UniProtKB/Swiss-Prot annotation:
Domain Protein kinase: 62-313
UniProt function note: Catalytic subunit of the AMP-activated protein kinase complex also known as the SNF1 kinase complex (Snf1c), a central regulator of cellular energy homeostasis, which, in response to a fall in intracellular ATP levels, activates energy-producing pathways and inhibits energy-consuming processes. The complex phosphorylates histone H3 to form H3S10ph, which promotes H3K14ac formation, leading to transcriptional activation through TBP recruitment to the promoters.
Basic and acidic residues bias locations: 484-493, 564-573
Gene this protein is translated from: SNF1
UBA domain sequence ranges: 360-397
Region Disordered, residue ranges: 1-48, 410-435, 482-525, 564-597
GO molecular function, one term: protein serine/threonine kinase activity
Organism: Fusarium virguliforme
Protein name: Sucrose non-fermenting protein kinase 1
């Protein structure tokens, strides 16, 4: 099929060119210059046709079986690659539905991140096919969802829950190592393959983490969101995923959400206070780990490194998930570039790389009907093709074998690398005969409300061993093999009670309001040391001091780029036909000859200051004529420093002023990139001068 496609392509191009020339032969022969001016106009017409034919060939390499689901941007279909026979998922995104820049950016982020990530527990993006009307993402196929698995089987035993949690956390750690935070971890975004292995999907809400920057967008599901996310506070990123992982671990072991309420403000209040109950029958190691992950203060919350060192997590940890994980550092192949042999197994010897490359190319040659030389030529071309798509699909299977099981090089080619990974559910899949179950109640009773629990709790509290030893398990811990429809429906309702409240939580509600009084917070110990200047001023008074210090040091403000977009409507409502500045100037009797750009404008964020600091002005004010020509010559590469100053609220009544260097400006007006600056001392010198100026009295 494919070779005939190439012949049709050549035939179509020749017919197209002759069809263009045919009317020219019937007309009188025009001048030579006019001929040369007309012929180049026909050449670009062949290029879109050639690209369209190649795109149709790439799409024709997949046979669509059925529709898996439909989202806000398009459909997801199950397909089979004709050349390799492997099942893939085609995520078809309609361009007309990407009506806003935010939607288009979300799709672009998902494509960019999935092309970067290569991990056994992250959905792989094989290739992307773009047409004028659609964007087709060829993804790894995983047929199940962790959410449906929990609904069907209920809460899990400790070993099975640990296995799912280990796979999920190691994949999240891999994302964080590549500066990517997911921000929407939940059972619906954790897919399961045929061997019940976790695959993280849906990176549309993800963000790249950069040093010194904080995220503020409230996104994700409210029940799995961290307190700093629903509160609209700034967060770095990794601590948000840690909180979501803790909620998911709780769901795996208990079968319900730790924070749940039908009223959104009440739900937010519970999350903000961190009020949840741990069942008495939960394993002690898992309970302690959940307590460390579900800490309201992100500074005190457990990190990925802390979780990896936890004894409960390291129990029965597979070898391929243990540190170090350099085997997963490969970041895929760009279809627009030539494919090299060492891409298939970067850490393997050269002979092994060549052997694996030959196995992949031979399989493609046999299944697709191409000669081996044609396959090699297509792989070296700097453009996408159907051969490259097939190579990437077969290549992923080989990489999984080499990365997880080095001994797989000696196994037959068709063996799957994931078949050896046992499922904890298979050991408990034996069916037993049980009596008909009564109708499940929708009323949940706290275990602490039962008399037996209360009596046991009081006795252990008197003995002083409430948190040391778990009580006797009064509830049968044997998990049911079969679940009734009523139980499944109730579990599904409990796990996603607010399915419509998925995105932009800060727009759906304001700050959470406390519904009922909760236990008073514990007294925190005062901080014994800090970096910077101690001040008892309120935040606006502190900012006023900073503004005065910057003015004395000769700094100038950089206009806020977001000011016009954020305050245009407010100015129009406040001023009517004209602006507030115009009416104010008119009331004072001033002329309109003042440059509008020189008028004072408040920044979009009053707690964020962006200034340009002329280094020569600082020298004149602070050092006078003490500088020597040699020192001035040393500062000539940078003529100005761009500085971002922002104030954060660490705790109630405790604030932190952060100084961040946003770049160095040269004499030509060019802003140096971060990688072009090799020394931090110019920025530290400026920050020290600002701190000294703040320490001085007015």
């Amino acid at each position: 099929m494919a070779p005939r496609g190439f012949e049709d392509e050549e035939l179509t191009i020749s017919l197209s060119s002759s069809h263009v020339r045919r009317p020219q032969q019937q007309q009188p022969p025009p001048p030579t210059q006019q001929q040369h001016a007309h012929q180049p106009g026909s050449r670009p017409a062949d290029a879109p046709l050639k690209e369209r034919i190649k795109t149709e060939q790439r799409i024709g390499a997949y046979k669509v079986l059925r529709t898996l689901g439909e989202g806000s941007f398009g459909k997801v279909k199950l397909a089979i690659h004709n050349g390799t026979g492997q099942q893939v998922a085609l995520k078809i995104i309609a361009r007309k539905k990407l009506i806003s820049r935010d939607m288009a950016g979300r799709v672009e982020r998902e494509i960019e991140y999935l092309q970067l990530l290569r991990h056994p527990h992250i959905i792989k993006l094989y290739t992307v096919i773009k047409t004028p009307n659609e964007i087709i993402m060829v993804l790894e196929y995983a047929g199940g969802e962790l959410f449906d698995y929990i609904v069907q089987h209920g809460r899990m035993k400790e070993a099975e829950a640990r296995r799912f949690f280990q796979q999920m956390l190691c994949a999240v750690e891999y994302c964080h190592r590549h500066k990517i935070v997911h921000r929407d971890l939940k059972p619906e975004n954790l897919l399961l393959d045929e061997n019940l292995n976790v695959k993280i999907a849906d990176f549309g809400l993800s963000n790249i983490m950069t040093d010194g920057n904080f995220l503020k967008t409230s996104c994700g599901s409210p029940n799995y969101a961290a307190p700093e996310v629903i509160g609209g506070k700034l967060y770095a990123g990794p601590e948000v995923d840690v909180w979501s992982c803790g909620v998911i671990l709780y769901v795996l072991l208990v079968g319900r959400l730790p924070f749940d309420d039908e009223h959104i403000p009440s739900l937010f209040a519970k999350i903000a206070k961190g009020t949840y109950s741990i069942p008495q029958w939960m394993p002690l190691g898992a309970a302690n780990l959940i307590k460390k992950m579900l800490v309201v203060n992100p500074v005190h919350r457990a990190t990925i490194e802390d979780i990896r060192a936890d004894p409960w997590f390291t129990t029965e940890l597979p070898v391929y998930l243990q540190l170090p994980v350099e085997e997963f550092f490969n970041t895929g192949v760009d279809p627009n570039k030539a494919i090299q042999k060492n891409d298939i197994a970067p850490n393997a010897p050269e002979k092994v790389q060549e052997r694996l490359h030959n196995e992949v190319t031979e399989k493609i040659s046999k299944t697709m009907g191409y000669g081996k030389n044609d396959v090699e030529e297509a792989l070296q071309a700097s453009e996408p093709s159907a051969i490259k798509d097939a190579y990437m699909i077969v290549r992923e299977n080989k990489m999984m074998q080499v990365n997880q099981h080095p001994e797989a090089l000696l196994e037959p080619e068709g063996s799957s690398p994931m078949l050896s990974m046992s499922s904890a559910r298979s050991a408990t899949s034996t069916t037993t005969t049980t009596a008909p179950r009564p109708y499940v109640s929708k009323v949940g009773i706290l275990p602490s409300s039962l008399p037996a629990y209360h009596k046991d709790y009081v006795e252990r509290e008197k003995a002083g061993s409430v948190n040391n030893s778990p009580p006797q398990v009064l509830i049968n811990d044997e998990l049911p093999v079969t679940r009734t429809d009523a139980e499944k429906e109730e579990t599904s309702r409990r796990l996603r009670p607010h399915s419509r409240s998925q995105l932009r939580l800060d727009e759906a509600n304001t700050r959470p309001q406390g519904m009922t009084p909760i236990n008073p917070p514990k007294k925190t110990k005062p901080v014994r040391w800090q970096f910077g200047i101690r001040s008892r001023n309120s935040p606006w008074e502190a900012l006023l001091c900073i503004h005065k210090a910057l003015h004395k040091l000769g700094a100038t403000y950089i206009p806020d780029e977001d000011y016009e977009s954020r305050h245009a409507e407010e100015r129009a409502e406040a001023s009517g036909n004209g602006s507030f500045a115009d009416s104010y100037d008119g009331s004072r009797g001033s002329t309109t000859s003042i440059d509008p750009m020189k008028r004072y404008r408040l920044p979009a964020d009053p707690w964020h200051i962006n200034v340009r600091w002329d280094t020569s002005a600082i020298k004149k004010k602070l050092q006078g004529s003490a500088d020597t020509p040699d020192k001035r010559q040393a500062h000539e590469p940078f003529v100005a420093l761009h500085l971002d100053i922002q104030i954060y609220e660490m705790e109630h009544g405790v604030y932190l002023v952060d100084f961040k260097c946003s770049g160095y400006e040269t004499a030509t007006g060019r802003l140096l990139e971060e990688k072009e600056v090799t020394s931090p001392f110019p920025f530290l010198d400026m920050a020290a001068k600002l701190i000294m100026q703040l320490a001085e009295a007015d």
